[in-house]
Swiss-Prot record:
InterPro entries reported in the protein's UniProt record: Dimethylallyltransferase, IPT, P-loop_NTPase
Enzyme class: transferase
GO molecular function annotation: ATP binding; tRNA dimethylallyltransferase activity
Organism: Streptomyces coelicolor (strain ATCC BAA-471 / A3(2) / M145)
Enzyme Commission number(s): 2.5.1.75
Any one GO BP annotation for this protein: tRNA modification
HAMAP family: IPP_trans (MF_00185)
Origin: domain of life: Bacteria
Interaction with substrate tRNA, as annotated region: 40-43
Residues engaged in binding ATP: 15-22
Binding sites annotated in the UniProt record for substrate: 17-22
The protein's name: tRNA dimethylallyltransferase
Cofactor entry: Mg(2+)
Reported function: Catalyzes the transfer of a dimethylallyl group onto the adenine at position 37 in tRNAs that read codons beginning with uridine, leading to the formation of N6-(dimethylallyl)adenosine (i(6)A).
Length: 312
């Protein structure tokens, strides 16, 4: 007599860029009768396809993917708005008896979707003052200030990401506490299995370099040109995306396209280290090797994690 299949719950496939999260998410959705919910902040933008490594319709293997292509490039990303949209979709899938497969490397977005997080409000006066300072002094100066006020937040936020630096400093001023202190403990609102895809750094760096080369060959520069005509340069969030920021700089004559490509590789490697550090701090993540030697075993091991009771 066979046992009943496990009741649907939320699966979060996390880890650094280029680790193989998207393919694993599709596999799990196909095997479990689930649907993918995007947790990559830059894949939320319409038209940002090549540079974000967004799966093509063919690569999605017939699996519905939610929260892709929902914002214009001029829209400023909001994790609070993402939280609302993601939970709406997760709740609907669970009500239908389907497995929500959250896939992405944006750590705060993943936590916003599955954890008991409430995001502090904004103060227009503080925000305006910090944005003026950002314009005058640049993100590096504000990042240095953040490193003093909240070293953990500074480690998690790229020094070039002025928008996120401003937000962290704003929250610190509003609450009188470090930005990271406003993130509560690991208190999930859903029964969630978190699977981290782990790739050794040398191999991951090779994958990143190869991925950037393929993006250039696939037409990233033309994609950025087209999006620039739609307001990409004015978009506070989208214009900072890896690859897009570097190509925009080249199109503005600030560097060559070859230099932009090399800087995209360097910046992506730095970003991958930050992603890895973020997810390593969460004890609920069950890490599985996504290295080339273990790639064939990864789907089976992930499925076995999901199909048995998981604590933590």
């Amino acid at each position: 007599m066979s046992s009943a299949p496990p009741a649907p719950r939320v699966i979060a496939v996390v880890g650094p860029t280029a680790a193989g999260k998207s393919d694993l998410g599709v596999f799990l959705a196909q095997r479990l009768g689930g649907e993918v919910v995007n947790a990559d902040s830059m894949q939320l933008y319409r038209g940002m396809d090549i540079g974000t490594a967004k799966l093509t319709p063919e690569e999605r293997g017939g699996v519905p993917h939610h929260l892709l292509d929902i914002w214009d490039v001029t829209v400023t990303a909001s994790v609070a708005e993402y939280q609302r949209l993601a939970r709406e979709r997760i709740d609907a899938l669970l009500a239908e008896g389907r497995w929500p497969i959250l896939v992405g490397g944006s750590g705060l977005y993943v936590r916003g979707a599955v954890d008991n997080l409430e995001f502090p409000g904004t103060d227009p006066g503080i925000r305006a003052r910090l944005e003026e300072e950002l314009e005058l002094r640049g993100p590096g100066a504000l990042h240095a200030r953040l490193a003093v006020a909240d070293p953990e937040a500074a480690r998690a936020i790229l020094p070039s990401n002025g928008r996120r630096i401003v937000r962290a400093l704003e929250v610190i001023e509003i609450t009188g506490r470090p930005f990271t202190a406003n993130l509560p403990g690991h208190d999930s609102v859903y029964d969630t299995v978190q699977i981290g895809v782990d790739v050794a750094r040398p191999e991951l760096h090779e994958r990143i370099a190869l991925r950037v080369d393929r993006m250039w060959e696939a037409g990233l520069v033309d994609e950025v040109r087209a999006l620039e005509a739609q307001g990409l340069r004015e978009g506070r969030t989208a214009s900072r995306a890896l690859g897009y920021q570097q190509v925009l700089a080249a199109l503005a004559g600030e560097c060559t396209l070859d230099e932009a490509r090399a800087e995209t590789v360097r910046a992506t490697k730095r970003f991958a280290r930050r992603q890895d550090s973020w997810f390593r701090r969460d004890p609920r993540v069950h890490w599985l090797s996504g290295g080339v030697a273990d790639r064939t075993e990864l789907p089976r091991l992930a499925l076995s994690l999901v199909e048995r009771p998981v604590t933590a």
